[in-house]
Amino acid sequence: MRFKQYDIVKHFKYETLTDEQKKQNIYLYQILAFPVKHTETGEELVIYKALYECHENNMDVNLGQIFARPISQFFSGVDTVKYPNIKQEYRFELIKHMDSEIHNSMITHCNLTPPQRKNRI
């Protein structure tokens, strides 16, 4: 699956959240740029930002915090041995296509709730 700049994606750990946590957009991100080359190694990266703030359960993420992850890891499948109860197939999956960056002040006004997922066969 390929994403575009500004797409909203969810991390597979979204499935582990309570309904209340899901309302806070935890584990939802917006892709800012890819591919981006690491200046030292030449490795291709995805640059993305958090659409939530969370400082509990071993998480320390600020709203709008920027992350970089190698493309190969970003597009990798979920390790079903380590996470046997996860139904999502890939580490990140598309929620919504967007045409521009969502600014932090707009996040609470956007409907970012993922649609209900059909069970994988």
Question: Where on the chain are the PLM-derived regions?
Answer:
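Short coil-to-beta transition motif at edge beta-strands of beta-rich domains
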Residues: 1-22
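Short acidic, Gly/Pro-enriched loop/turn segments at secondary-structure junctions
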Residues: 37-43, 81-85
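Residues that flank catalytic or metal-binding motifs in active/ligand-binding sites
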Residues: 5, 27, 44, 88
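Intrinsically disordered, low-complexity, charged/polar segments
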Residues: 55-121
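Short beta-strand-centered aromatic/proline hotspots
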Residues: 18-36
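A generic structural motif
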Residues: 33-38, 52, 75
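Conserved beta-strand residues within beta-sheet cores
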Residues: 6, 28-30, 68
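Short solvent-exposed strand/turn elements
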Residues: 39-63
